[in-house]
A protein has these predicted regions:
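Active-site metal-binding loops of divalent metal-dependent hydrolases
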Residues: 74
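Active-site-adjacent loop and "lid" segments of alpha/beta metabolic enzymes
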Residues: 2-62, 77-156
Length: 156
């Protein structure tokens, strides 16, 4: 179950995940659907992510949900600087206890500063994929599957 709300938008979602024992993707985002894309000032995005994940993981485990994948929520309420810090310090996100999912494919924090379209940043995206995988990310959410597969094969 891929949940962009951390269980906050649907009161029955986490109960259903617990009952079905499905893997659960916990994404970091702002507190409400209406403001999830508003940029928030974080003193330290990595500390904020880990604090938020820690609280949510405790809630999940109390419900019997242990198969958790963490998604730091690229593109959801974070500045360009915060997102590049998340890439640079991805190894510090999530306590190394949970797989980390990274979804940076075709994100505006990459293409807008370059003056390109989302479909024109594949090379830049693959370079960032390589970087996060080298730093410990386990799962990539992608649009360009063949190129990402090639990137992963080249890393082996």
């Amino acid at each position: 179950v891929n949940d962009i709300s951390g269980g906050d938008f649907d009161e029955n979602l986490l109960k259903t995940v617990a009952e079905t024992k499905l893997p659960y993707i916990l994404m970091h985002s702002n507190s409400t659907y209406q403001n999830m894309h508003e940029k928030i000032h974080y003193e330290d995005i990595i500390v904020s992510l880990n604090y938020s994940f820690s609280k949510k993981i405790n809630e999940l485990q109390k419900l019997g949900i242990y198969d958790v994948i963490l998604d730091p929520g690229f593109g959801f309420g974070k500045t360009i600087e915060d997102q590049y810090k998340m890439i640079d310090e991805v190894q510090h996100i999530g306590f190394e206890k949970f797989p980390l999912l990274i979804g940076i494919s075709r994100k505006s924090f990459i293409y807008k500063p370059l003056g390109k379209l989302p479909t024109e940043i594949n090379e830049e995206t693959q370079n960032l994929h390589r970087k996060v995988l080298e730093k410990g990310a386990k799962i990539l959410r992608v649009h360009d599957v063949a190129d990402t597969k090639k990137t992963i094969e080249e890393m082996r």
